[in-house]
Amino acid sequence: MPRRREVPKREILPDPKFGNVDVAKFVNVLMLSGKKSVAENIIYGAFEHIQTKSGKDPLEVFTAAIANCKPLVEVKSRRVGGANYQVPVEVRPVRRMALSMRWLREAANKRSEKSMPQRLAGELLEAAESRGGAMKKRDEVHRMAEANKAFSHFRF
């Protein structure tokens, strides 16, 4: 590993419409090929769908969905004596947020609605109620960690 100083984290500016840093991060997660305006339109469209579908505040639904999808533990492979063990480790807060957003994006992509804003709105509403594909992924990761609890003494 290089012995240079640690590179400082970049400051992410809050998004222009809601003034929320998490929404800005999610825009960056959704963005493909540097097309930020397209990603913003998808998110703002999804927020409009949430407003019309449920009548709830879209920002509250978004924060609830992200909070519900955050994993507490995950498994990492560790090689000990010629065997690979899946060792459960606690997830750092920054990674929790990143995984949560990534799983929401992937679950929304797999849905069958016609447009991406509709798919994202549906997934966010379901995740806010602890249902949906992203929640299924989080529960699967938690189950894996629970099943491999016996190897937790192989700490990193």
Curated annotation (Swiss-Prot):
Keywords, ordered alphabetically: Ribonucleoprotein, Ribosomal protein, RNA-binding, rRNA-binding, tRNA-binding
One GO biological process term: translation
Cellular component GO terms, alphabetical: small ribosomal subunit
Pfam families in the cross-refs: Ribosomal_S7
Domain of life: Bacteria
Molecular function GO terms recorded: rRNA binding; structural constituent of ribosome; tRNA binding
InterPro entries: Ribosomal_uS7, Ribosomal_uS7_bac/org-type, Ribosomal_uS7_CS, Ribosomal_uS7_dom, Ribosomal_uS7_dom_sf
SUPFAM superfamilies in the record: Ribosomal protein S7
Cited function: One of the primary rRNA binding proteins, it binds directly to 16S rRNA where it nucleates assembly of the head domain of the 30S subunit. Is located at the subunit interface close to the decoding center, probably blocks exit of the E-site tRNA.
Family: Belongs to the universal ribosomal protein uS7 family.
Subunit structure: Part of the 30S ribosomal subunit. Contacts proteins S9 and S11.
Name of this chain's protein: Small ribosomal subunit protein uS7
Gene responsible for this protein: rpsG
